[in-house]
């Protein structure tokens, strides 16, 4: 069964109506070749109700479907936040964003660290990343679409967040008490080559530092592993 993330729809009785979403309607018609009675699921980008539907009527501008089942909104869970240093290639960024979404990261912040090759994200690339997140959410059946934001400096995230910095192996001591922390956790992933001293100066006092022992991984590999670890640490 196909899940669609739909920002706007109407519920009337046991019917759900979708308007002004030509991309979704075209996908049902031309890609899935859906006939009347076709079953699919729809949810909003936020963690709200999920509707299981049976197609009843369809035109070029609108579709109507019978609500077969409604799953209530999930209970609120601690959020997973990741701060990602921009990698050296757009392809790596797209892969990491896709996997963060599949893992269930709630909010993703992009940032140009001192060693970042990419220093910013133009609107077209942000739009492409948003599309990748939507497709990954639909594929993984996650309950909400991550929020994606580019920030100029980590200082804007200091308030009420516990920074866990994932970097190259270090002799610096770090604690392992994150699970008991009362503050929401924010994982930080540096670029290949590691974070610089100036980067570290931009983090709040009391941040923790962690590494994958002696392993030196590609940035995209490390980012995926750490996002999964942080998600499971919180849950």
Where are these predicted regions, by residue range?
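N-terminal positively charged helical leader segments and presequences
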Residues: 1-72
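Fold-independent oxyanion-binding glycine-rich loops
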Residues: 7-8, 45, 86, 151, ...
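Hydrophobic side chains in well-ordered alpha-helices
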Residues: 28, 92-96, 199
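RNA substrate-binding interface of SAM-dependent RNA methyltransferases
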Residues: 72-162
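Active-site/ligand-binding-proximal alpha/beta "capping" segment
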Residues: 161-201, 205-212
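Structured adenosyl-cofactor binding patch, chiefly the S-adenosyl-L-methionine
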Residues: 197-235
